[in-house]
Amino acid sequence: DIEKMAVDYLSTLKPVEKNENYDPIRHGPPILREMSDERRATLIRQNPDYGIIICRCEEVSKGEILDALRSPIPVPTVDGIKKRVRPGMGRCQGGFCSPLVTQIIAEYLDCPLEEVRKSSEQAVITYGKTK
């Protein structure tokens, strides 16, 4: 059984204890465009980042982008965020929101804009400031 094999292997690396509060159903991050106005208002009161719409075409908020960056398997590229949360998938194809997504990634990673990549280490978005 896979569970026993995983526990046996992991216990060789570090102590493994049973989590009595384990929930086998993964509850994903909130998706604003699928919420009622009441639920959306509640979420924005709890975290104002959900009230900052970054992608108007797909109704993606700053909070949703930050959720993707903070996830257990983070996506620190513009295309990774696009695939996970959908900014840039709408009519404008990222013409308006891609610079904002890039800025949010740079702020979150605490790095200059020049270090944020489109999809891989070789996919440079900006080489430097022009002004």
Please annotate each region the language model reported.
Residues 1-91, 95-131:
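Helix-rich C-terminal "cap"/substrate-channel and partner-interaction subdomain
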